[in-house]
Regions:
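Short beta-strand boundary microenvironments
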Residues: 115-157
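Transmembrane alpha-helical interface segments in multi-pass membrane proteins
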Residues: 266, 279, 284-333, 357-369, ...
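Hydrophobic, regular-secondary-structure patches
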Residues: 32-118, 137-139, 144, 200, ...
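Hydrophobic alpha-helical transmembrane segments of multi-pass inner-membrane transport and secretion
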Residues: 17-44, 252-288, 311-320, 365-368
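C-terminal membrane-exit region of the final transmembrane helix in multipass inner-membrane proteins
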Residues: 3, 354-389
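Short, membrane-interfacial amphipathic segments enriched in basic
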Residues: 1-7
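Mechanotransmission and gating elements of multispan inner-membrane complexes involved in transport
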Residues: 87-90, 107-114, 140, 156-260, ...
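Short juxtamembrane loops and helix-capping segments at transmembrane helix boundaries
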Residues: 328-356
Length: 389
């Protein structure tokens, strides 16, 4: 069975430039929306997963979903600190950080609208446990003082959080003495200060979370057994990366489901547009189809040729839409994580999986939009097609 050359199919698309551009443009818009939504969810998840270190473990109160909801009293923290699975630093001290985590309300710099921001009580050991955090402006806060440092996203996005400015919360004025960058992690959306000073100011007696590094990643199971077998403890331990990944799950799913639904609705219009274009192509090339059949090309060859034309149309739209979506990686975004009730800044992330999904989506639109017109072309008899000429 002779096949119609691909070059012939491509030339037919170029011969109808206006309809090709309009149809491919419609598909490109749908793919742009589809890819952008997937990039949004991927960026959120990547940011929160990157927040944790692979060898770090976080301990929170049993049943708590976030650090803000958690509370660990000092006796419980002291028990955990004795576990032999916790790594020690060069000075012989256990690499464990006891941290209060609180939400405060700050006005956004541009709009003045209030939003929740995480305040974390940090310790020198806590800084050592997060090597991705580095001061990029000013200096680190001094322990025992009312000094704080702000993540880059907070310093840029909220009033009073830039270096040299003052924030008032917990009945005290706090001076921003530095800005830190934590890479593409959730710490960029936090403010850090001295842990003990924050506990006193917020009149708290318990920590929100314990973070420590393991001697050996395999020691996590032993830590969990120690906690579960001790009736004095009402806490649980999780790998830090898993803990922060879980916090992104609900919002990422919501974004993905909403975006996919919108994309499917939009795709119906794009499919109809492709179908109209392909039907018009079949109608204008009736005599051509008859000639191809007279030259010995089978119905299947005609079907495949018109389907290939629709698939090429979808592929062109997919590549254009994906190219447009890729520029969204340069756009920073912040939103409320309704699982933690705090502001989080992140960026769109384009992954190979998203590229594959977007192109596959474009090809599916092309196939669905082109199948019926292609089937109509394949069903034409030689006599009827030539007579129509």
């Amino acid at each position: 069975m002779a096949a119609i050359p691909v070059s012939y199919v491509a030339r037919n698309l170029m011969a109808r430039k206006l309809t090709t551009i309009l149809t491919a443009g419609g598909m490109a818009l749908v793919v742009y929306v589809f890819a952008t939504v997937l990039m949004l969810a991927a960026g959120l998840k990547e940011t929160l997963v990157a927040t944790g270190e692979p060898d770090n473990v976080i301990v929170i109160r049993r049943g708590s979903q976030t650090e803000v909801q958690s509370g660990i009293d000092r006796p419980s923290a002291a028990i955990v600190e004795t576990y032999p699975e916790i790594a020690t630093g060069e000075d012989g001290r256990k690499l464990i950080s006891k941290e209060p985590v609180v939400l405060i309300n700050l006005p956004k710099r541009e709009t003045g609208k209030p939003s929740n921001v995480v305040i974390r009580g940090a310790t020198p050991i806590g800084l050592a446990l997060r090597p991705q955090v580095r001061i990029v402006e000013g200096r680190m806060f001094r322990p025992g003082t009312s000094e704080i440092v702000a993540g880059r996203a907070i310093a840029q996005g909220f009033r009073g959080a830039a270096i040299g400015e003052t924030l008032r919360f917990a009945q005290r004025d706090w001076t921003v003495v530095g800005v830190f960058d934590a890479g593409r992690t959730g710490f960029n959306s936090e403010i850090w200060g001295d842990a003990e000073q924050l506990l006193q100011s917020f009149r708290r007696v318990s920590f929100s979370a314990l973070v420590f590094r393991l001697n050996d990643p395999a020691g996590l199971d032993a830590v969990k057994r120690n906690i579960e077998s001790d009736p004095r403890l009402q806490i649980e331990a999780k790998p830090e990366q898993q803990f922060y990944s879980d916090q992104s799950e609900q919002l990422a799913k919501f974004i993905s489901y909403l975006g996919t639904t919108i994309s499917i609705i939009f795709s119906i219009g794009a499919i109809i547009g492709a179908m109209i274009t392909m039907y018009a192509s079949v109608a204008s090339r009736t005599s051509e189809i008859g000639t191809l059949r007279a030259l010995g090309f089978s119905r299947m060859s005609i079907l495949v040729a018109f389907l290939l034309e629709a698939l090429l149309l979808g592929l062109v739209g997919g590549v254009i839409g994906l190219s447009g979506a890729s520029f969204m990686q340069m756009v920073p975004i912040s939103t409320m994580n309704f699982q933690t009730f705090s502001e989080i800044a992140f960026t769109f992330t384009l992954t190979p999986r998203i590229i594959g999904a977007a192109l596959a989506f474009a090809l599916v639109m092309g196939f669905v939009g082109g199948f019926l017109p292609a089937a109509r072309a394949a069903r034409m008899s030689i006599v009827d097609a030539l007579r129509a000429a």
